[in-house]
Design a protein with these regions (language model features):
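N-terminal secretory signal peptides that target proteins for export/translocation
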Residues: 1-10
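Phosphate-coordinating loops and pocket residues in cytosolic domains that bind phosphorylated ligands
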Residues: 35, 40, 73-76
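Membrane-proximal N-terminal amphipathic helix
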Residues: 42-70
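Periplasmic/extracellular, small/polar-rich flexible segments of pilin-like filament-forming proteins
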Residues: 2, 66-152
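N-terminal single-pass transmembrane signal-anchor helix
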Residues: 10-38
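Residues at secondary-structure transition points
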Residues: 12, 41-48, 52, 105, ...
Length: 152
């Protein structure tokens, strides 16, 4: 039986070098465009974790006040209340991105601070340290950006 179409010789299939380089160039452009957005999202996520850790530390301070009727220790030589181990860093497990501490306390007030770990992923963050006081007033230190930008 005769074929109506003559058979072409079998051609090797695969990718040419030009096609591979084109794909690599497209992937490089996509990575260059998407990485800054990813890094911004990651910083926001770490900052949100630190904000949640500050709220947890604030609840701890409220429980301390309920038990002792004051936010400080009552000892003039060591007035600041130390936060227990799970509350003194953000995230609670793994490598710390922020250190959570009581930076000011007296009988009727306190200020909590979330300070980026030096040489950590949040060290170059423009928001600097996040603060929270007994009235849940939010603040930032060591930066020129607004509180609203950092406490989203």
């Amino acid at each position: 039986m005769r074929h109506l179409h003559p058979r072409l010789p079998h051609r090797l299939t695969g990718f040419t070098l030009v096609e591979m380089l084109t794909v690599l160039a497209v992937l490089g452009v996509l990575a260059a465009v998407s990485y800054p957005s990813y890094a911004t999202h990651l910083h926001r996520a770490h900052r949100a974790d630190a904000q949640a850790a500050l709220m947890d530390a604030a609840f701890f301070m409220q429980r301390h006040y309920a038990a002792h009727h004051r936010y400080d220790t009552g000892d003039a030589s060591a007035p600041l209340v130390g936060l227990p181990a799970p509350l003194n860093q953000s995230p609670r497990q793994g490598t710390a991105h922020y250190l959570i501490s009581v930076t000011q306390a007296d009988a009727g007030s306190y200020t909590l601070s979330a300070t980026p770990v030096s040489h950590g992923p949040m060290a170059p963050d423009t928001c600097g340290s996040l603060t929270l006081n007994q009235h849940h007033a939010r603040g930032i230190t060591g930066t020129t950006v607004s509180v609203a930008q950092c406490w989203r």
